[in-house]
Structure formats: C-alpha cells, structure tokens
Amino acid sequence: MGDAGLIVIGGATATGKTALAIALAQQLNSVILSADSRQVYRGFDIGTAKPTPAQQQQVRHHLIDICDPRETLTLAIYQAKAQALIAHYHAQGITPLLVGGTGLYIRSITQGLTMPQVPPQPHLRAQLMALGQQECYQWLQQVDPVAAQRIHAHDQVRTLRALEVYYTTGVPLSQQQRREPPPYRIWYFALTGGDRQQERCRIEARTQEMLAMGWLDEIQQLQRQYGEDLPLLDTLGYREMRQYLRGEVTLAEAIALTVQHTQQFAKRQRTWFRAEPDIHWLQATTLEAQLAEIQAQFTLCPKTTATKRRMS
C-alpha cells in the first residue's frame, strides 16, 4: 500500500462493518478506530452493537469506552483524539481503519472539519434540558436552521451541543465549521446492505441477539447507575426497550418499534453516505468477496482515493 494512509469503512447500521473491519485489520496487521457516537460511552455496550471483548482481543480498537455517559464528547474532542491516533500509527508506518456509521465523525477526519473549541457548559445544558427536546429543537430551527436540517428532531445530544455552541459564542455552529483536508491518502468504502427486506431481517435478528445477550439487564443497570433522565437512555433502541420495561408496550411491540426506527435511521445514514465524495460502494455480499474487492481498489487506485460509486 505504500505510504501510510487511512482506510474508511462506513455505511448504515447492521451491514457487517465490524466483521469486515476485523478481517481486513487482521490481514493488514492494523488497528481499528471506531466512528460511532454512542460506542464512545462506557456501559452502553449491547444496545450500541459495540465490538465484544472477544472481538476487541482479535484486533486493537480505539475510541471505544472513552467517555462517562454523564459527560459530553464533542465532535472537536473526538476529532482531536482520532487525528492523534492516526498520526501515532502513521509514525509506525501503519494505515489504520476508521470504521462506523456516524457520518459526521468520519467527515471530520476525511474532510478535516475544523470545529469550534467550545467546552461543555453544564449550567446552560441543564437549563436547555429542562425545556425538553421538542422545544430545544424548535429553538435550534430558529437560531441555526442549517444545523437543524442535519440533526434529527429526536437527537438530544447533538441538538443540545448546537445550542450550546450558539448561546456561548453567538455564532451558529454551521457557520463555524471549516474544512482542512488531511494530507494523507484515504480509501473510503461503504457497505450497501442489500435490499430493504434483507435489511429488515438483519436488524430484527440483531435485535433478538441483543436481547439474548442481556440488553434489558444492561438498560436496568444503566438506569440504576445514572438515573432514568440520562439523555443516552432516550436514544435508538434504548428508548423503545425502556417503553417495554415501563409496561407501556409488550416486548413484541418494543422489538417491532426498534426494527422500524432502526430502518428509518439506516435510511438517513444511507442518504448521508451517498452525499459523501470518493466513496467506493462495495458490491460484494460475502466477507471474502468484500475483502477481495477492497484489495483490488488498493491495486487500481494506488495514488488517489477510491472512485465514487453510488448505490443503484
């Protein structure tokens, strides 16, 4: 592969990114940098599909379990940590893998987004949280409509952060982001995940697997440890399963809601990744074929990023 660069594996949830990344990292004797905005938080393991301890023993993982759930990991902090790790491995001649479905995390590295250096404001955040997510999002639509278009109405963490930046600096977050592309080579791959029925089956199977692994116990432990008002407990999957634990829906209904909302989230992820430049969409459906397709791109594109291919 020549000089050290960066391999990115993105795509929607439940498309097999983790398995592919581990196999590729083993082939290349490399490491994995997680690009998942929930896997950074300790204790949120099963419901975020965090690589298991066994998987983490196979290949060294970074940017997992680096933050207390009561704290806020800003994009600027994530970016700084990721860039430092990339530089560390480049100095050893290693090309690391950046893997995940949080498109903004990936973009902050591949396009070099420069983020405002605004530390968390606990008192302001507490005041905003008291208003509730619906009112906060309405405020965001007024003060920073560009950011509001990028942030889902139920994404409390990013909504609060955007408002925090605005009320601290007086300048909308969307106006403070600049781009400084990195100097190293990037290979950017994404997984398609097949058709919608295949996607639904995978998501449902993964949800059942999470439950079998003890997801409900994890949620109850998190509630006991951090309280039921923890914003992360109101994120995808955790929110629906807590409805079941409160007796508001049956388990079957909670599973159906989780699958439905996860598919909706996956659609938004695909929309994001389709808009990213220089992505090679992997057409292969088996792990072995995907690895071969990636290796072929190293041969075909030795000096540039991979050619973009949109999903059909």
From Swiss-Prot:
Cofactor (UniProt): Mg(2+)
InterPro entries in the cross-refs: Dimethylallyltransferase, IPT, P-loop_NTPase
EC annotation from Swiss-Prot or TrEMBL: 2.5.1.75
Keywords: ATP-binding, Magnesium, Nucleotide-binding, Transferase, tRNA processing
GO molecular function: ATP binding; tRNA dimethylallyltransferase activity
BP GO terms, sorted: tRNA modification
Residues marked Interaction with substrate tRNA (site): 102
UniProt KW Nucleotide-binding keyword: yes
Positions annotated to bind substrate: 13-18
Database matches in Gene3D superfamilies: 1.10.20.140, P-loop containing nucleotide triphosphate hydrolases (3.40.50.300)
This protein's record includes keyword tRNA processing: yes
Ligand binding (ATP): 11-18
Reaction catalyzed: adenosine(37) in tRNA + dimethylallyl diphosphate = N(6)-dimethylallyladenosine(37) in tRNA + diphosphate
Pfam families attached to this UniProt entry: IPPT (PF01715)
Annotated stretches, region: Interaction with substrate tRNA: 36-39
UniProt xrefs under HAMAP family: IPP_trans (MF_00185)
Sequence similarity: Belongs to the IPP transferase family.
Function: Catalyzes the transfer of a dimethylallyl group onto the adenine at position 37 in tRNAs that read codons beginning with uridine, leading to the formation of N6-(dimethylallyl)adenosine (i(6)A).
Subunit composition and interactions: Monomer.
Protein name (record): tRNA dimethylallyltransferase
Gene source species: Thermosynechococcus vestitus (strain NIES-2133 / IAM M-273 / BP-1)
Lineage, highest ranks first: Bacteria, Bacillati, Cyanobacteriota, Cyanophyceae, Acaryochloridales
